Amino acid sequence: MLIPHLHFCGCCGEAIALYEKAFHTKAESIVYNRDYAPDECPDDDRIAHAVMDIHGQKVFLNDRFGNKDKSLDCAVHLIVMFPSVEELLACYAFFKEESTVIDPFVKLPYSELSGNFMDQFGVQWGFMTE
């Protein structure tokens, strides 16, 4: 099994809240640093480990090694396949205002609608229809 692991810089909780709304899902589990290492980090609200299901794919998330610079120069982004243009656009509406477009949404020979963007947390996404 291959599991994408998304890293954030202290904003993992915000990302989880957005992804829960956009993808109509809930985090399966969240472990905070204060729970993971209570003696060392009793008041640390950063997330040590979280698990979500996004479109049928298990995804891990945490507050380590995040993309501080939010650079577009990245070799990896997550592709989400939608059954319809309407569902794609409804999900993208949650990201649109604070995202950076990498490739605008257009019709391609293999997809009715496809586009790439970086969300406000520095995660790069590709949304396309099946």
Where are these regions (language model features)?
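Core segments of cupin and vicinal oxygen chelate
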Residues: L6-G56
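Short glycine/proline-enriched turns and hinge-like loops at secondary-structure junctions
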Residues: D43, S71-C74
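Short, solvent-exposed beta-strand edge segments and adjacent coil->beta transition regions
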Residues: M1-I3, D73-H77
